[in-house]
Amino acid sequence: MSPARLPISRESCLTIPAGFSPSALLDSPVLLTNFKVEPSPTTGSLGMAAILHKSAHPDMLPSPRDKSVRNAHEDRGSRDFEFKPHLNSSSQSLAPAMSDLKKHEHSMQNQSMNPSSSSSNMVNENRPPCSRESSLTVNVSAQNQPVGMVGLTDSMPAEVGTSEPQQMNSSDNAMQEPQSENVADKSADDGYNWRKYGQKHVKGSENPRSYYKCTHPNCEVKKLLERAVDGLITEVVYKGRHNHPKPQPNRRLAGGAVPSNQGEERYDGASAADDKSSNALSNLANPVHSPGMVEPVPASVSDDDIDAGGGRPYPGDDATEEEDLESKRRKMESAGIDAALMGKPNREPRVVVQTVSEVDILDDGYRWRKYGQKVVKGNPNPRSYYKCTSTGCPVRKHVERASHDPKSVITTYEGKHNHEVPAARNATHEMSAPPMKNVVHQINSNMPSSIGGMMRACEARNYTNQYSQAAETDTVSLDLGVGISPNHSDATNQMQSSGPDQMQYQMQTMGSMYGNMRHPSSMAAPAVQGNSAARMYGSREEKGNEGFTFRATPMDHSANLCYSSAGNLVMGP
């Protein structure tokens, strides 16, 4: 190899320490900052004086990177020598190294005179087993043969024509490229079968997130995978552990296998040796970053661990990321099933009352508040909804007219009242018999004073309609129509005690006194009848006499439902 093709580092500036002569550079074809020392093809000397001088004064190194690299040399009892850069070297190890290098310098000069001894030292038998150390062996050949073979146990390429900045870049790229290829290769198949069930954009991430689930029955392991636009996987998160072994290769889902990076990474000796041989110079330039220093990843990854692909643990700060889509769907379905099973509390039996009325609202003794109205299917008449106004009472009812009979009102009650029937309002009492009271006043105003005084006894009396409902039954009973007066028994007893003869005598006397009286306008007085059909007073126009007369009719006491006055008639709703 010609000296022009030897690796020569090109620095932007070169600092020459004091007391150093530039003529020392002629002894070696490499610069001071390059520690990959090779013997001179012309003289065979190594020119280590400058290197030893710089090792004794580390503060005079021209490059900050060289300050962190120290060389420790050991004599292994052979004619070869090795440069072994250590991560944690110090200046204390430089003192014995100086004496060792002097001995190696003399041995190398003797070695150049004996060409036959160079062929027996091509392979280093004392290679250190530690993978974190990189060894460099320099073999010296005959004086008239150019020496350019630098290598480890394996053979190296013949041409090494890269500069030191390019070596640094290649070392960084050599670290990044295996990682990206590793992720792509490891993510191709992890040995399990996955099924994709969702994809969405999450907060704080530019790439969409895909959700996968293990296809094995009863396996709850899920996987969250983020893939960039170019197809590179940026993040993989596993949730849970597999409760089954890996399926057989022939049973794997080849087409639908989802990339992931679960599994154990192992580096055998052959692959490690290949990495060292291909990146020997870059490892010497930057020994901290080495592919051989990658530690194996545990086989299973849980929620609390970092995934093998360099991802981060599953984030829990965002509420939308805590649960995946399938778990949300399952929860919603289970909630719907629970709601369907539980349902609403068991409703009380419904009670339907159908009556014929001109008005929709029937007075059943309770107070109601209307809270809605709508038209139901199959009935053109609207349905009104009412609620009991009593506090805490759950009873409701809805009133509607029948579709087949507009005069029929259907009232449906739901629930039971938990309170007594409220007291009737005054408006209800006054509305019970106002028509009869008006008729009596008309009679009194149109009659003479004597007859009007007699008819005052016929003024209407107000009585309360009594509605009853069983406390613990599902039937609502409404007493519609004519009510029974509470003074009915007293009036009946008085009528019976007077006797039919006495009553007839009194009525005949009154007729004789006012028989000759004529009313200016012939007004027919309304006949007030009880259930016995007894007519106590009335007006009758006869052919011969057109005067106002009274006629007493014998009363039927068997019915026992007569009334002493017109006020006993109670109007129904």
From Swiss-Prot:
This is WRKY transcription factor SUSIBA2. Residues 108-122 have a biased composition (Low complexity). It comes from the Eukaryota. It comes from Hordeum vulgare (Barley). Residues 64-85, 183-192, 263-277 have a biased composition (Basic and acidic residues). GO terms for molecular function: DNA-binding transcription factor activity; metal ion binding; sequence-specific DNA binding. Residues 56-133, 157-192, 240-332 are annotated as: Disordered. Keywords: DNA-binding, Metal-binding, Nucleus, Repeat, Transcription, Transcription regulation, Zinc. InterPro entries: WRKY_dom, WRKY_dom_sf, WRKY_plant. It is found in: Nucleus. Expressed in endosperm, but not in leaves. GO terms for cellular component: nucleus. Induction: Up-regulated by sugar. Belongs to the WRKY group I family. Pfam families: WRKY. Residues 163-182 have a biased composition (Polar residues). Expression of barley SUSIBA2 transcription factor in rice yields plants with increased starch content and reduced methane emission. Residues 183-247, 357-422 bind DNA.
